[in-house]
């Protein structure tokens, strides 16, 4: 089925009981709120619609992310923010990783999230015999030295027949830093590590467990909070927002305000249920 182009979210609003908004590229970018996006969010909430921010960002705790969104002018509550990092406690519980020394490639907030999950966080250069690696962000550590250290440590553990668990909270490869300005993020670091580990270890290379979009755990958390699956995913990236929703059995709307610029006749793969070139604010 070809994507349906709409001119306003009003056209399809009543088909859904809840809405999942990506953050960067949909509601905001590195310069602040995206014009129109925040107003659509506010209008939906005023009309009694359930809304959540569903973001791969894991450089902040949910509390910090909520405070940052509010400071930008977005009216949002803590229970409306689902970050990929906030999935760590459930994952550590399910996989029996509590009490494990955990190497963190991320921010101070990521260390805090690991502690809340029951892990014992450390840096890659701390000379700890860690058994868990979490790739969450690309800042606040020396990039190349850290990747070299993690590659070496994981290879040594696997070759010594010791368990090693790799977790990627944020599978995004790039992100919009500002209008027309892009940067690499955590998913790209994991790609480098995966390639290096596969080259050295072959079939014994441990895979990354991926928690954020387009993978199922973050959508499952949204469904758990909503209590149903009648949700519309609104995103700007085909490879994360749209693919993830499609795979999970949710409808998706691609908004052309972020990484994917929608042009007439453009073939979109994967294909969203709807497309919207830019945010338009209803008169009511």
What are these regions (language model features)?
Residues 1-49, 58-82, 89-284:
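Asp-based, Mg2+/Mn2+-dependent phosphohydrolase catalytic module
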């Amino acid at each position: 089925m070809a994507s349906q182009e709409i001119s306003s979210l009003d056209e399809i609003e009543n088909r859904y009981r809840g809405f999942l908004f990506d953050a960067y590229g949909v509601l905001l970018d590195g310069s602040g709120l995206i014009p129109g996006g925040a107003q659509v969010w506010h209008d939906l909430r005023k009309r009694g619609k359930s809304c959540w921010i569903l973001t791969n960002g894991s450089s902040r705790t949910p509390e910090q992310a909520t405070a940052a969104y509010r400071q930008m002018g977005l009216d949002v509550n803590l229970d409306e923010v689902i970050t990929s990092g906030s999935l760590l406690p459930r994952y550590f519980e399910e996989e029996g990783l509590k009490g494990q020394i955990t190497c963190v490639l991320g921010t101070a907030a990521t260390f805090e999230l690991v502690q809340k999950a029951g892990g014992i966080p450390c840096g890659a250069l701390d000379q700890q015999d860690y058994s868990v690696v979490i790739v969450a962000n690309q800042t606040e550590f020396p990039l190349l030295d850290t990747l070299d250290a993690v590659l070496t440590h994981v290879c040594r553990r696997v070759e010594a027949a010791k368990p090693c668990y790799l977790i990627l909270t944020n599978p995004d490869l790039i992100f919009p830093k500002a209008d027309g300005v892009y940067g690499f993020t955590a998913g790209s670091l994991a790609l480098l590590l995966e390639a290096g580990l596969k080259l050295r270890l072959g079939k014994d290379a441990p895979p990354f467990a991926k928690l954020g979009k387009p993978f199922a755990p973050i959508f499952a958390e949204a469904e758990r909070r909503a209590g149903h699956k009648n949700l519309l995913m609104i995103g700007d990236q085909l490879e994360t927002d749209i693919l993830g929703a499609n795979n999970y059995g949710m409808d998706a709307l691609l908004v052309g305000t972020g990484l994917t610029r929608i042009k007439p006749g453009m073939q979109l793969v994967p294909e969203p249920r709807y497309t919207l070139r830019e945010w338009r604010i209803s008169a009511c």
